[in-house]
Amino acid sequence: MSKGHSLQDPFLNALRKERIPVSIFLVNGIKLQGQIESFDQYVVLLKNAVSQMVYKHAISTVVPARNPRATGNPAMAAGATAAPAADEGYGNQ
């Protein structure tokens, strides 16, 4: 499992389990809304009136309607931020 999944998977899973509505912004600017039904390494299944399979490489931002509860994951504890440290940005891979 890569380092990025240690934050991404618990966050998406909490949004899925709690059925929190999300807005997903794509890299081309399109805004999708719904609930995360499922996800894997490459795609997110977003459910609204219909289910849409959205490739993760096309996603810019995931904005939940509310914060998920922290469930034993220190990365999701109150006050924790999702922003990478200065030396952990995507440009340094």
From Swiss-Prot:
Which chain positions lie within coiled-coil regions? Answer: none
Would the keyword Nucleotide-binding turn up in this protein's UniProt record?
A: no
GO CC terms, sorted:
cytosol
Which biological processes are named by the entry's GO terms? regulation of DNA-templated transcription; regulation of RNA stability; regulation of translation, ncRNA-mediated
Please tell me whether the keyword ATP-binding is annotated for this protein.
no
* Biased composition range(s): Low complexity: 74-86
Q: Which UniProt keywords apply?
A: RNA-binding, Stress response
Q: What S-S linkages are listed for this chain?
A: none
Residue ranges of the Sm domain?
A: 9-68
Which portions of the sequence form the region Disordered? Answer: 74-93
GO MF terms held by the record: RNA binding
Q: Can you state the subunit structure given in the record?
A: Homohexamer.
What PANTHER family does the annotation carry?
A: RNA-BINDING PROTEIN HFQ
State what this protein does: RNA chaperone that binds small regulatory RNA (sRNAs) and mRNAs to facilitate mRNA translational regulation in response to envelope stress, environmental stress and changes in metabolite concentrations. Also binds with high specificity to tRNAs.
Q: Which family does it belong to?
A: Belongs to the Hfq family.
State what protein this is by name: RNA-binding protein Hfq
Q: Which organism is it from?
A: Alcanivorax borkumensis (strain ATCC 700651 / DSM 11573 / NCIMB 13689 / SK2)
Gene (name only): hfq
